[in-house]
Amino acid sequence: MSGVVRTLSRCLLPAEAGARERRAGAARDAEREARRRSRDIDALLARERRAVRRLVKILLLGAGESGKSTFLKQMRIIHGREFDQKALLEFRDTIFDNILKGSRVLVDARDKLGIPWQHSENEKHGMFLMAFENKAGLPVEPATFQLYVPALSALWRDSGIREAFSRRSEFQLGESVKYFLDNLDRIGQLNYFPSKQDILLARKATKGIVEHDFVIKKIPFKMVDVGGQRSQRQKWFQCFDGITSILFMVSSSEYDQVLMEDRRTNRLVESMNIFETIVNNKLFFNVSIILFLNKMDLLVEKVKSVSIKKHFPDFKGDPHRLEDVQRYLVQCFDRKRRNRGKPLFHHFTTAIDTENIRFVFHAVKDTILQENLKDIMLQ
């Protein structure tokens, strides 16, 4: 009996040894595969880290209506991303809305300011326009907009409405209303599609966070626009991670205007207060902050007739001399900085002027790369 067992054992031993070798081989293969996968993951993570390190993330900050969204549109235009049909239709809807709402504001302001009509028959045009309501927030169709074009044209020609417009610092009126009303014959056509200039001047408050990605000399840029109204500012903190630079935008021409939110606070003072909070925040100690004093085209015109000294009594100089006003504006923001070791980079800009923004952003890009990305290796 024992001989039989020994014989069976000798027969089974090679089979067991082969199984052990196969198991060991499988384990070695699995280990090699695990090491390969680990190397692949490490390489992927390294590529992602390099990509994140190379990404230039620019945050656009500033009070409402300072020109952030217009600047972002310019980045799309300058870097070759055309607006598709859907976007053009949305801009058309926004432009119709800007015209109708702006004209209603002017009709209402004329009445409240006690300005008489030049032509009494325009009162019925005014009443027709004031009866317009779009409670559902639905887009205004071109055929519907055309019904209002005769009334809009007649009202815009009336000296009573023009006088109300000249006193627009006393109430809230969008800056693009004049441009659109001046171009009403073109915009009122049934087959109207917005031009690039129309798109730049279309005003719609930013809600939430809007991003735009583009590449310059193989360096990826991400530009982030966040709503500037007081109700939107709590969303700013969601965007602070990984910031390379902040472009802080100010409407330089609004020194005689108050906020839409409270109708008391001077708009320029509000911008200075926001800037002070941002520029002195420890989170941004190593972040370059570049000041854009925007709407230069409007500032040039306003300085001629509206004295900044009336609203800022500490102003020294000629209130109707552009260079004196510009110098004062830069000083106002510069005084808000506690860290005097870093320079304040600033530019006077006109966000609706593509060539101006192209030139300024070229300089800004160089500043950002020199100040914050000296370790970037261009491929």
UniProtKB/Swiss-Prot annotation:
Binding site for GTP: 65-70, 200-203, 294-297, 351
Main localization category: membrane
G2 motif as annotated region, ranges: 198-206
GO MF, one annotated term: protein phosphatase 2A binding
GO biological process, one term: adenylate cyclase-modulating G protein-coupled receptor signaling pathway
Phosphothreonine PTM sites in chain numbering: 206
Annotated stretches, region: G5 motif: 349-354
Assembly behavior: G proteins are composed of 3 units; alpha, beta and gamma. The alpha chain contains the guanine nucleotide binding site. Interacts with UBXD5. Interacts (in GTP-bound form) with PPP5C (via TPR repeats); activates PPP5C phosphatase activity and translocates PPP5C to the cell membrane. Interacts with RGS22. Interacts (via N-terminus) with NAPA; the interaction promotes CDH5 localization to plasma membrane. Interacts with CTNND1 (via N-terminus); the interaction regulates CDH1-mediated cell-cell adhesion.
Role according to the record: Guanine nucleotide-binding proteins (G proteins) are involved as modulators or transducers in various transmembrane signaling systems. Activates effector molecule RhoA by binding and activating RhoGEFs (ARHGEF12/LARG). GNA12-dependent Rho signaling subsequently regulates transcription factor AP-1 (activating protein-1). GNA12-dependent Rho signaling also regulates protein phosphatese 2A activation causing dephosphorylation of its target proteins. Promotes tumor cell invasion and metastasis by activating RhoA/ROCK signaling pathway and up-regulating pro-inflammatory cytokine production.
Annotated protein name in UniProt: Guanine nucleotide-binding protein subunit alpha-12
Species assigned in the record: Rattus norvegicus (Rat)
Gene: Gna12
